[in-house]
Design a protein with these regions (language model features):
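Bacterial signal peptide processing site
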Residues: 32-35
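Amphipathic alpha-helical scaffolding segments comprising HEAT/armadillo-like alpha-solenoid repeats
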Residues: 37-55, 76-91, 111-124, 145-158, ...
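C-terminal motif of bacterial Sec signal peptides marking the signal peptidase cleavage site
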Residues: 27-30
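Residue-level detector of extended alpha-helical repeat arrays and alpha-solenoid scaffolds
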Residues: 64, 98-99, 129-133, 166, ...
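Short inter-helical turns and helix N-cap capping residues of alpha-solenoid HEAT/ARM repeat scaffolds
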Residues: 59-60, 94-95, 125-129, 160-162, ...
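Conserved hydrophobic register position within alpha-solenoid helical repeats
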Residues: 67, 102, 136, 169, ...
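Pro/Ala/Gly-rich low-complexity, hydrophilic intrinsically disordered segments
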Residues: 212-258
């Protein structure tokens, strides 16, 4: 009888070592296949029906928040039935993350009257949640209503130590061409946070058409030189609420098939343009040629 001598290559040895693991995987389908199912579901977006169902889940705040976010970022997220849900959550929701998502949604799809519903939430006397206060201030950048000016000013000039909220409030005030707003923004230039200074200066520039930087003294001198205060805002520029923008990363230039699109700055609901003006993000029309 001739004996056979088997020679094992490194590749064969590694295969034999993996065999017990593969066998265990086949004998434990409840673990392995469930894991693959979870991975697959993570790449499959939820349907509008599922998003709406999650947004109304009475037991799971995480699902409610996720559902609200998905609905509010969809094209149909401004339907009346969803607006009523956002408003209800702004008023009555107990989970701060769900309420913050609802405030953001209402800022995106709401009306000028909704600014009245949102404005109390920028105050530290109403909520301790910094996130809620910040998203409320951001939402008010998108909704124009002069009735909220007083509360915006109060937050900007208060002794509160929340710089992010104050900076967002300073941006929102850039919509309102009022003397009291000008004075409040001057105080914003003295804030110890640079972000508040920069946003206050930008709002002053939008309101007046002037460029005096971060110097409160220079802005005050310009103000004092204006004999007719009724013409203080004669050079006002159109206000556009800011949106998230970023440059492409290096691999996005290579992967040209990846299409990234971002929301473009626009004017708040309820704010009529000062005059016919083609903004930076508008397409040219026949009248412009």
């Amino acid at each position: 009888m001739i004996g056979l001598q088997l020679t094992y290559t490194p590749r064969m040895r590694s295969t034999w070592l993996l065999l017990p693991l593969l066998t265990a995987g086949l004998t434990l389908p409840g673990c392995v296949f469930d894991d693959f199912k979870d991975i697959g579901e993570s790449f499959q977006p939820k349907s509008p029906m599922q998003a709406a169902t999650d947004a109304l889940d009475p037991y799971n705040a995480d699902l409610r928040r996720e559902g609200v976010v998905l609905l509010s970022t969809a094209d149909f997220g401004g339907a009346d039935v969803y607006l009523n849900m956002y408003r209800d959550y702004v008023e009555h929701e107990t989970d701060p993350l769900v309420r913050a998502a609802a405030i953001t949604a209402l800022g995106r799809h709401g009306t000028t009257e909704d600014a009245i519903l949102i404005v109390p939430w920028i105050s530290s006397s109403v909520t301790d949640s910094q996130n809620i206060r910040w998203v409320a201030a951001k939402a008010l950048q998108r909704l124009h209503n002069p009735e909220v000016v007083e509360e915006l000013i109060r937050v900007l000039v208060s002794d509160d130590d929340d710089g992010e909220v104050k900076a967002a409030v300073a941006v929102a005030l850039g919509q309102y061409s009022e003397d009291r707003v000008f004075q409040a923004l001057l105080l914003g230039l003295d804030d110890r946070r640079l972000s508040v200074n920069v946003d206050a200066a930008q709002s002053l520039a939008t309101l007046t058409g002037q460029e005096w930087g971060l110097s409160r003294t220079d802005w005050q001198l310009w103000y004092d030189r204006q004999a007719d205060k009724s013409k203080l805002f004669a050079g006002r520029q159109d206000y556009f609420y800011p949106t998230y923008q970023r440059d492409k990363l290096w691999f996005e230039h290579i992967a040209f098939w990846i299409q990234q699109s971002y929301e473009q700055p626009s004017q708040p609901a309820g704010l009529a343009p000062k005059e016919k003006h083609r903004g930076t993000w508008d397409e040219p029309t026949l009248d412009d040629t």
